[in-house]
Amino acid sequence: MIFKVGDTVVYPHHGAALVEAIETRTIKGEQKEYLVLKVAQGDLTVRVPAENAEYVGVRDVVGQEGLDKVFQVLRAPHTEEPTNWSRRYKANLEKLASGDVNKVAEVVRDLWRRDQERGLSAGEKRMLAKARQILVGELALAESTDDAKAETILDEVLAAAS
């Protein structure tokens, strides 16, 4: 996949990002192109070797079809999850690291429902906040709206599904 300056992409763990520049760096005598990504949430800039962009999970923002699938995931019935906190946390961490928007939606759905039913530990609350931030950023881009509106959409879908 070829990215150009000005493209909006999604970077795993951080969500939506703008390709701010493409720079050439010399490392061990070899010139390589790097994508300079400015993450939408917070003040973070990430440099990714262009040849490894897909490998690390950099991808385009979901389209309408992808958005419909995300909403299906959010509305899906509750899935059985490990009762052991550490196993559940690790499984959710792996889903977030995958960079797959549907897996991020699963984490948001499952933690949100667990929070409604039993409450969450501090670690899971932070994870839910991070997963929501990633999902809201992508929803805002996919719907061409701001984060506040995307958050409202997410809350409505979650509330309607429970």
Curated annotation (Swiss-Prot):
Signal peptide range: none
Record carries keyword Cytoplasm: no
InterPro entries assigned: CarD-like/TRCF_RID, CarD-like/TRCF_RID_sf, CarD-like_C, CarD-like_regulator, CarD_C
Observed effect of gene inactivation: Essential for growth, it cannot be disrupted.
Effect upon mutating residue 25 to E: Weakens interaction with RpoB. Abolishes interaction with RpoB
Gene Ontology biological process terms, A to Z: rRNA transcription
Sorted UniProt keywords: Virulence
Highest rank taxon of the organism: Bacteria
Protein's UniProt keywords contain rRNA-binding: no
Role, per record: Controls rRNA transcription by binding to the RNA polymerase (RNAP). Required for replication and persistence during infection of mice.
Family membership: Belongs to the CarD family.
Assembly and oligomerization: Interacts directly with the N-terminus of the RNA polymerase subunit beta (RpoB).
Name of the protein in its database record: RNA polymerase-binding transcription factor CarD
